């Protein structure tokens, strides 16, 4: 299977950002906020995304912990993501 130039670029970026991405995941894990109360996590993500140049709508859909982030560099592919990061009581993260 051949790897396209775009795939090589994406893989190189992930490799370069690996430590930062890992630290970001650890930070959210450490907040360990239960469902509907992810206030610190949400605020951290919103700040982080804005620092990276995203336009962020916080409080999306009337939910204080929900947000929608958007970034564009022109026409091209669109990537959508959805994340659940609440801690579940009784499991290792809560």
Regions found by a protein language model. Name each.
Residues 3-94:
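Acidic/His- and Gly-rich active-site-bordering loop/insert found
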